[in-house]
């Protein structure tokens, strides 16, 4: 009988656990199956499979799920970054309009690195709201794009814009009849995202450098410090949990019956 070391046993056990927690929609975020599952053409009249990454601010999609976006794009998916705001409050000492112009250019530069498309919503950084008008705006984008997969913020977060973004997407998911797979991503866990316990991981080791290149496009945000002090350590920590160098972590929310948070009338 072949002897199995404790390390190999743990790694195998981790793999079994990851498989058990794999997505019901053919393991979209299961790193071991990305190259195989995601390279296959869509079953819907040959159209590309589509994912939306919906973030509250410019730089949120790239920092919370940039590696996964790149892997999806490499596998032939159409990926759209949806920015709830233009980052109007994100640069001290200048007007909201000036900040928005700078940060919009940074978003476009980041999307050129990743290859994702981009869309901007009409909310204002630091003053996002939950009402029917803003809910309809998110729902209209989702209905127009018809994604199979949506990634957005984890709802338990110290930043109000992150919470509002998460709730708006959640209600759109419910109203659409759970028509897409919904995943929550973490933002600076322990500082912003709280009580985040992953159900799924993606090994982003092969694309970590490209993810960081996209993040660095957001020059106005002091990204070297943000990456070095928060995001890269978080990627390495999730990598240790998933037995790789760098990983992104997610919570997969499955459809259920629950009251809406948004007024529908």
Regions found by a protein language model. Name each.
Residues 51-58, 62-96:
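ATP-dependent adenylation/pyrophosphate-handling site
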Residues 84, 111-126:
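A conserved beta-strand->alpha-helix junction
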Residues 79, 118, 180:
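Hydrophobic anchor at the start of a short beta-strand
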Residues 88-101, 124-129:
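Acidic/histidine-rich helix-loop elements
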Residues 59, 85, 107, 118, ...:
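Divalent metal-coordination and catalytic microenvironments
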Residues 94-114:
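Glycine-rich phosphate-binding loop and adjoining beta1-alpha1-beta2 segment
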Residues 1-4:
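N-terminal secretory signal peptides
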Residues 6, 10-19, 30-54, 112, ...:
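Metal-dependent de-N-acetylase/amidase catalytic core
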